[in-house]
Amino acid sequence: ADDRNPLEECFRETDYEEFLEIARNGLSDTDNPKEGWYANLGPMRLNEFSQENENAWYFIKDPGVLDYPVKPSEVGKHDDIFAYEKRFDEIVGGMDKEVTVTYQTSEKFEPPLPPK
């Protein structure tokens, strides 16, 4: 059986002394001048993001594709439907029940009779 400790094996790397020297003293100066190509060119300039692309996001098109938990009524629907339903509920806010409530309320109270 191999009784060697994996941690001890790390210290037996062929480059261990070189890495230890870099850790103690830092990297040496480069031979190349400080001009020319740099890997870090600052913040990247990304193209404008558009969710209207057919292949943009699977979650938006059908959240069930990625096995996200969805209600049976949500299967196969995309975000536009959910957003529409939410806005509709916010705008309507129970207005569909207003007629019934008004009718029930009017039955409870009798209107005052006009003066004779």
Curated annotation (Swiss-Prot):
Protein name: L-amino-acid oxidase BjussuLAAO-II
Cofactor requirements of the protein: FAD
Recorded effect of pH on activity: Optimum pH is 6-9.
GO MF terms, alphabetically ordered: nucleotide binding; oxidoreductase activity; toxin activity
Amino acids binding FAD: 42-45
This protein's UniProt keywords: Antibiotic, Antimicrobial, Apoptosis, Cytolysis, Disulfide bond, FAD, Flavoprotein, Glycoprotein, Hemolysis, Hemostasis impairing toxin, Nucleotide-binding, Oxidoreductase, Secreted, Toxin
Coarse class of the protein's main subcellular location: secreted
Gene3D superfamilies in UniProt: 3.90.660.10
Species for this entry: Bothrops jararacussu (Jararacussu)
Function: Catalyzes an oxidative deamination of predominantly hydrophobic and aromatic L-amino acids, thus producing hydrogen peroxide that may contribute to the diverse toxic effects of this enzyme. Shows very high enzymatic activity on L-Met and L-Leu, high activity on L-Ile, L-Phe and L-Tyr and moderate activity on L-His. Exhibits diverse biological activities, such as hemorrhage, hemolysis, edema, apoptosis of vascular endothelial cells or tumor cell lines, and antibacterial, as well as regulation of platelet aggregation.
Compartments where found: Secreted
Regulation (activators, inhibitors): Its enzymatic activities is reduced by the presence of Zn(2+), Al(3+), Cu(2+), Na(+) or Ni(2+) salts.
Thermal activity profile: Optimum temperature is 60 degrees Celsius.
